[in-house]
């Protein structure tokens, strides 16, 4: 049983008083006892063989209260906020009211809540139709991309002058005011001219030169250069061009078509297949853009009480996005530490990156939740089972492990949000 009392002097905050039933308390105490009994020594008993009754006689059940609380509190708190119908923001401040022996426990939580949402029009919306047409130029550009992918780098004679798009193999030795700096030297480095691999102005000064030449390249490091001791400074790079290589493209003919796609026999067939592939991709992109536009309009039509999203909600979203992103990298074998080392980014950099758009994401989520409530969307047990099966297949997990990792309320929440999006977008019309 829970009781929600809004704060009189502060918006979007209140006190939630709730009970943990005695049966749940007993279960928590039992689990806590099982975790500790192997560490307890009592004369006359081997380690791990002491009974719970004797343990309580010697130490009192209060000795296990904190561990038992840690075990039972998450589910009890979640049930209490569900019963109260509130959406908490951030971590609550929870304190015990009473924890008497043999009785249910009563707790009090000071909770910040999400702001109230006033929905506007969200059904039968009209948004601009998305372009799904595939032009000949689109097909030609894709064929050109495939052609570039089949290109070969061919070594050129020394008389050939370098052009943008060529690759040069160089040695370079950089200095500032005659003093060499870390990272300013390299040997047999392959540099594609025009790629922007080096600082602005470097690659352009190699255009027009030939293999065998020594070239002095004068540049100025950008003011925001990552190495602060070089930022804004003029530098000289002494460069030796060893080799010049130029892309040679294959002929666009039937043989080329067969090389890039074994399922076709002619260039005409490749173009037709490419056109169909692009049409499918464009249709999917148009569908996604249409849905985004519809949801965006529904969000614009709604309003947030106080016109402000709590900072805690934005911070929660940013951390969730970061954890999800780093978790995906972890699945690819890239640890958190490895990512920061490879990318050169810091946690603050990543936080700033995901801060962009966080307020819109949070507001969209709040409005979709309001639509779920307004439309009385309540996923069935069958839908939850289907969701569990889908997640189990996606992550190659057993279904019971999925249920252990994700609460039923969270599963239902995710399903309901998708149902809300579908209801809004299905009712919309492209004009």
UniProtKB/Swiss-Prot annotation:
Q: Where in the cell is it found?
A: Cytoplasm
Q: Which PANTHER family match?
A: TRIGGER FACTOR CHAPERONE AND PEPTIDYL-PROLYL CIS/TRANS ISOMERASE, TRIGGER FACTOR-LIKE PROTEIN TIG, CHLOROPLASTIC
Naturally occurring in which organism (per UniProt): Leuconostoc mesenteroides subsp. mesenteroides (strain ATCC 8293 / DSM 20343 / BCRC 11652 / CCM 1803 / JCM 6124 / NCDO 523 / NBRC 100496 / NCIMB 8023 / NCTC 12954 / NRRL B-1118 / 37Y)
**What does the UniProt entry state concerning the protein's domains?**
Consists of 3 domains; the N-terminus binds the ribosome, the middle domain has PPIase activity, while the C-terminus has intrinsic chaperone activity on its own.
Task: Briefly state the protein's biological role.
Answer: Involved in protein export. Acts as a chaperone by maintaining the newly synthesized protein in an open conformation. Functions as a peptidyl-prolyl cis-trans isomerase.
Where would I find the PPIase FKBP-type domain in this sequence? Answer: 165-250
Swiss-Prot/TrEMBL catalytic activity:
[protein]-peptidylproline (omega=180) = [protein]-peptidylproline (omega=0)
Record GO cellular component, one term: cytoplasm
| Domain of life per record | Bacteria
Q: Which GO terms describe its biological process?
A: 'de novo' cotranslational protein folding; cell division; chaperone-mediated protein folding; protein transport; protein unfolding
Q: What class of enzyme is it?
A: isomerase
E.C. code: 5.2.1.8
The UniProt keywords, alphabetically, are: Cell cycle, Cell division, Chaperone, Cytoplasm, Isomerase, Rotamase
InterPro entries from the UniProt entry: PPIase_dom_sf (IPR046357), PPIase_FKBP_dom (IPR001179), Trig_fac (IPR005215), Trigger_fac_C (IPR008880), Trigger_fac_C_sf (IPR037041), Trigger_fac_ribosome-bd_bac (IPR008881), Trigger_fac_ribosome-bd_sf (IPR036611), Trigger_fact/SurA_dom_sf (IPR027304)
Report the sequence similarity comment from the record: Belongs to the FKBP-type PPIase family. Tig subfamily.
Name assigned to this protein:
Trigger factor
Query: A GO molecular function for this record?
Result: protein folding chaperone
């Amino acid at each position: 049983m829970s009781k929600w009392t809004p704060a009189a002097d502060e918006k979007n905050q209140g006190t939630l008083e709730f009970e943990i039933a005695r049966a749940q308390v007993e279960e928590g105490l039992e689990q806590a006892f099982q975790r500790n009994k192997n560490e307890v020594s009592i004369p006359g008993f081997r380690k791990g063989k002491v009974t719970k009754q004797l343990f309580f006689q010697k130490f009192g059940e209060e000795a296990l209260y904190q561990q038992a609380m840690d075990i039972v509190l998450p589910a009890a708190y979640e049930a209490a906020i569900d019963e109260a119908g509130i959406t908490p923001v951030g971590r609550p401040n929870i304190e015990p009211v009473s924890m008497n022996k043999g009785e249910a426990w009563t707790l009090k939580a000071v909770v910040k809540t999400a702001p109230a949402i006033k929905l506007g029009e969200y059904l039968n919306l009209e948004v601009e139709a998305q372009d799904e047409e595939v032009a000949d130029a689109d097909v030609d550009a894709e064929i050109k991309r495939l052609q570039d992918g089949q290109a070969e780098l061919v070594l050129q004679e020394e008389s050939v002058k370098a052009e943008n798009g060529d690759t040069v193999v160089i040695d370079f030795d950089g200095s500032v005011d005659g003093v060499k700096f870390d990272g300013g030297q390299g040997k047999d480095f392959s540099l594609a001219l025009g790629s922007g691999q080096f600082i602005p102005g470097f690659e352009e000064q190699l255009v027009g030169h030939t293999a065998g030449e020594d070239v002095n390249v004068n540049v100025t490091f950008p003011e925001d250069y990552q190495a602060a001791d070089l930022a804004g400074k003029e530098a000289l790079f002494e460069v030796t061009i060893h080799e010049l290589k130029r892309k040679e493209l294959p002929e666009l003919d039937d043989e080329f078509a067969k090389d890039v796609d074994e399922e076709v026999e002619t260039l005409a067939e490749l173009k037709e297949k490419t056109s169909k592939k692009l049409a499918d991709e464009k249709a999917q992109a148009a569908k996604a853009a249409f849905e985004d536009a519809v949801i965006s309009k529904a969000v614009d039509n709604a309003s947030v009480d106080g016109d402000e999203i709590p900072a805690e909600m934005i911070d929660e979203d940013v951390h969730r996005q970061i954890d999800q992103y780093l978790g995906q990298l972890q699945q690819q074998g890239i640890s958190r530490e490895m990512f920061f080392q490879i990318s050169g980014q810091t946690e603050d950099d990543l936080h700033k990156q995901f801060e962009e758009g966080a307020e819109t994401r949070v507001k969209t989520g709040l409005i979709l939740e309001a639509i779920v409530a307004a439309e009385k969307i309540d996923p069935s047990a069958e839908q939850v089972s289907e969701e569990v099966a889908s997640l189990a297949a996606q992550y190659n997990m057993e279904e019971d492990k999925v249920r252990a990792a994700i609460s039923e309320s969270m599963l239902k929440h995710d399903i309901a949000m998708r149902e809300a999006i579908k209801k809004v977008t299905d009712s919309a019309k492209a004009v």
